[in-house]
Amino acid sequence: MNVLSYPPILDAISLVHLRKEVEYFYPLGYNKWIGKYDEPENTVERYILDSFDFLLSSQYPTAVGFEWWIENLDGHNTITLHSNHDDNYRKENGTLKYPLLSTELYLTNDIDPTTILDTKQGKYWEQYENNPPTEVVFSAPEEGKFIVSDPRYMRGVFGRCSSRTTLCYDVWDYKPKNLNRVGIVTKPFDVRFYKQEPSSPVQWLGKTKKMQLSINDQQFFKKFPNKYREGETWKVTQ
């Protein structure tokens, strides 16, 4: 699967500053935008621009900007299965367009993993490739951990109400309609990064549990590790 996991990429003080600002911004209401050559007005925008430049820019030279949002499980326990796509384009044209890459930065330690299926959404809303999935990646949060993945993969979170918080951005080669800057000006903290090498998910060979899910009214049981630790990333054959 096209999923890579980085060990914590931020030093402790940078993580504290970034998390504090994310908590201040939340809830956003709508996804936001920052252009590749825009001047950052806050620490969130600084992190997005600098992390892309530091970790990803050489692989995505056609990138023009970044759609970003905050995910938080406070008050609910599920982020339903979805792909990351240009939803405004879908509503206007009936087909789906996808970003170049999806990213997720964990701002808290937690046991509720990001679940990424190898089922991909296609050109049309009810079109799926490899449904039901044959492999599933489980990425357990750890402060500062960073994962990147194919935006077409169906993904979600299935856990419990908690303070689990992540900062996500997609890398685009055009600017989708109706995306704007957040418009909140703070003093951007100069976020500091560790040079980390990414790794692919490790194949899980231990005992598993099952959970029932559905895509497009097709139900299936996903197998997942019966126990794991914060920061681990596992791939489970279904």
Predicted regions, residues:
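Generic cytosolic/nucleocytoplasmic N-terminal low-complexity/intrinsically disordered segments
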Residues: M1, G144, G206-T208
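Non-heme Fe(II)/2-oxoglutarate
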Residues: M1-W69, H76-I79, I184-D190, R229-T237
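Catalytic core of non-heme Fe(II) oxygenases with the double-stranded beta-helix
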Residues: T62-V191
